[in-house]
């Protein structure tokens, strides 16, 4: 049984697609998988959130758990206060994650926004959650200009709390990368000190289940997380 937390250097870097890819690779390896989304924002009660996207891409077979949903597209802490809905408590998220871990080979926790976005009561963050669970973090990063600084800062913030960064995944790799992107692919490892686990091709989130399974395996099937 193992738990990994998936976070990003910012919002919209591909966390959901990478989480789905990790789940798909694990399913193809015969593992049981759970995905926990502590807080979903920017989606109405009846709307399709990130877990629906993961279900679509993996074709089912994954246990999906969402703990809180807030309608405005804001940090969960802010969205909860503005909506009047209850804030998440760190202890509750830890309990659910540990329960899932007892019944699944792999439990993935998808954060909201970046590492230090406030998620709930007392302003706890994804870093606090990873520390409480002793869960390694998979860091989803951008490919273009600015990513070296954002990545180095996030890895440094993890290290300051004693949280392991299992590796980096570029969440959207263009078909024709420019000079900065080609250089970043090499430099991300040297500036962060952690391995680059894989690159998800741009547009892979629009693929069919079968296509996505092949893409996910090609990108992450040989990473240490797939073993």
From Swiss-Prot:
Pfam families found in the cross-reference section: AAA_26
Describe the reaction catalysed, as an equation. (7R,8S)-7,8-diammoniononanoate + CO2 + ATP = (4R,5S)-dethiobiotin + ADP + phosphate + 3 H(+)
Q: Part of which pathway?
A: Cofactor biosynthesis; biotin biosynthesis; biotin from 7,8-diaminononanoate: step 1/2
The first-level EC class reads ligase
One GO cellular component assignment for this chain's record is: cytosol
Q: Which NCBIfam families does the record cross-reference, listed alphabetically? A: bioD
Describe the function of this protein: Catalyzes a mechanistically unusual reaction, the ATP-dependent insertion of CO2 between the N7 and N8 nitrogen atoms of 7,8-diaminopelargonic acid (DAPA, also called 7,8-diammoniononanoate) to form a ureido ring.
Question: What is this protein called in UniProt?
Answer: ATP-dependent dethiobiotin synthetase BioD
Q: Which organism is it from?
A: Rhodococcus erythropolis (strain PR4 / NBRC 100887)
